[in-house]
Structures are given as structure tokens and as C-alpha cells.
Amino acid sequence: STAFIQRMAGREQPWLLYHCTRGAHFDNYPNERFLGKSPAKHPYKDTLLELDEILGRLVETLRQTGQLEDTLIFVSSDNGPHMETWPDSAFTPFRCAKGSTWEGGVRVPGLLMWPGMIEAGRQSDGMFYFNDVLPTVLGLAGESERLPGDRYIDGIDQSSFLLAPEGLSN
């Protein structure tokens, strides 16, 4: 991913990088460099340290190539917590967990960063559905006309929610 970011430096065309990690999932196998490095000395917590380093490396590459201020960074999860995993099993204020359609199974945090555009430290309980990512990103890039018109897209442009200090989700 860092090589891709470096290649895209200086280009005027908007680009998208979808960087997925397997870390922090049910089976947690952090890189050996991170085993036992977290204060909890637990594989899940060690994996979080590894993910933090990976994200930090991507952000630093954006900074070094002069692209950070022009980049929206979105970090999230694909589901709620596992009920049966220790030490944080079902550590959630919501009903149920992964594998359920209750809020605890589908409501996850979303962290967004866009220096100069999204207010740092802002918190919201507003809803942002994963299907909103495509229309929102295209809208923010000024490319809404690229949204496919030959099929139904179950998502809406949430740009105003992200950019307005007191923006409300739709």
C-alpha cells in the first residue's frame, strides 16, 4: 500500500486505496515482533499494536508525499465483538454481538481523518452505513456522476454529515 501511495503522488486524478488487514479478528496472530508487546500481553492487544503501526506507516507515507491534506482516511470494523472471546467478550453497551442483527452485531465505530476538512476530535452517534461509502467518497471527490446508474446503489451521499461541525446523518 505504501508503494501505491508513493506512485500516486503528484497525480491530479482522485484515487482510492482499500487496505484490509486480517488482524484483530477471531484468531489473532500478530507478527512475531509484536508478541507480548502490549501491556496486557494478549494476542488481541498485541495485534492492535501491530495495526496501529501499519496505519501509522500509511499516514506517514501520505505526509511524506504531500498527500495527507488531500486524503480522507476511514478506519472501521466489519462487525461487533465476539461473545465468546476473552478478555473483552461482549464489551459493548449494545445488545448481542457478531452474528446477530441486533445493534451489538452490526454497529461498529468509524474513525475518519481528513486534515483541514473534518474537525479533529469530533464525536457523533450518527449512523453511517457501509453502503454510504461509495456515494459519499465519489461526492467528496467531485465525481458523483461516476456512481453507476444502471443498478440500484443502496447508499446515500453523507458528505454534509462528515464536513459540517454539527452535521447530521441522513
PLM features: residue spans?
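Non-transmembrane alpha-helical segments in soluble domains
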Residues: 2-9, 52, 56-59, 63, ...
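Active-site His/acidic residue clusters
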Residues: 2-46, 82-84, 88-92
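Loop/turn elements at helix/coil->beta-strand transitions in domains of secreted/extracellular proteins
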Residues: 10-17, 67-73, 106-108, 169-170
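Metal-dependent active-site segment of extracytoplasmic phospho-/sulfohydrolases and closely related
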Residues: 14, 50-87
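Structural recognition of the beta-strand scaffold that forms the well-ordered cores
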Residues: 15-20, 49, 72-76, 93, ...
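Solvent-exposed loop/turn segments at secondary-structure junctions
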Residues: 22-26, 54, 79-82, 101, ...
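Catalytic cores of eukaryotic secretory-pathway lumenal/extracellular enzymes that build
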Residues: 23, 45, 99, 107-108
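C-terminal cap/loop subdomain of S1 sulfatases and analogous C-terminal strand-loop tails that border
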Residues: 81-103, 118-122, 126, 131-170
